[in-house]
Amino acid sequence: MMSSEHLTCGWLQQLLLVLVKLCFTFAGPLRPLIGTECTAKSPASYILVFTGHWSPQAFPKQYPLFRPPAQWSKLIAVSHNRHFRLWEEGTPASAGVQHFAELGVTVELMKAAKEARKKRVVGAMYRTAGIPNGIGHSSTEMLIQPRSSLLSLMVKMIPSPDWFVGVDSLNLCEGNQWKQEVTVDLHPYDAGTDSGFTFSSPNFPTSPPENITKITSQFPNHPANSFYYPRLKELPPIASIRIMRQSRSRDHQSPMSNHILPNSISPQRFSATPLDCEVSLWSSWGLCLGPCSRGGVRHRTRYILLRPANAGTPCPELEEQSECVPHSCMQHQ
């Protein structure tokens, strides 16, 4: 007859095995996305329109006006399934993402996508022309297959250390139905490979590289950062994408387009972002000057670091004076 101790040990072992099985049952893979399978019977044709909203009214702080002025790189888009990620917030940037975010070079990014296409995890790659201004439009047509219904894209901000906008694994299919229209507001991301704080910062590699992070009005929490707006709860969208499904007959299929839309299309309007004045610390007090009979006066100054814009807080006084006793008078006392 087995002792109660042996029975207890056996029961604990069985419980442990059950718990381990449950863990493996519910712990799915980390990178692949769950619930993204598309069961549509045929591909869908879309037109993708990228719109830049990067204006001195919405983003007045350190707005790039020349060498080079604010502009957008070419757009790189990839259709894929759940086993591929072009980029992902909270993870390190690949070599291709780094080179594109820092330099606008697409060679390694496209090479990785082509290799993934051989493994049938990437469907197709698309691109649009760059936009020479902060405000503008570009577009391309896409033919999305059910087996690769996710869309990821990137556009580099020029100039910037390693900043970009984009979407990660946007699903254009829901069950067996293609979505008719999708609009997404875009915000800046930091690739984590360059430590520059401003649009025109010199090259300053981050060592070791950090994860891709979203830039907000409060992060990075440093006054020197070009997107630091402490009065704002969140930044206005700096760009957006609109994806519209197109009807397409089997007999006539127009060629894929890759063009900049005319400027006659009205850009989306956002309220102007207030930019408060920023001043330096006070200098040291100057010499106390004046006759001993009336007492002396000393001065100190500060200077403007950032001029206000869009009804931001005006600059305070830049010079201050106070009464004092001249040093020569103290010697006679």
Outline where the language-model segments fall:
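A short, structured loop/turn motif at beta-sheet edges
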Residues: 143-149, 175, 291-294
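Conserved beta-strand elements of beta-rich interaction domains across eukaryotes
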Residues: 53-57, 158-160, 248, 305-309, ...
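Extracellular low-complexity, O-glycosylation-prone Ser/Thr/Pro/Gly-rich "stalks"
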Residues: 36-37, 75, 85-92, 98, ...
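Thrombospondin type-1
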Residues: 90-91, 261-333
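Cleavable N-terminal signal peptides of Sec/SRP-targeted secreted and luminal proteins
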Residues: 6-27
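Structured domain cores in non-transmembrane regions
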Residues: 29-32, 37-45, 53-165
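Short beta-strand elements
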Residues: 168-185, 318-328
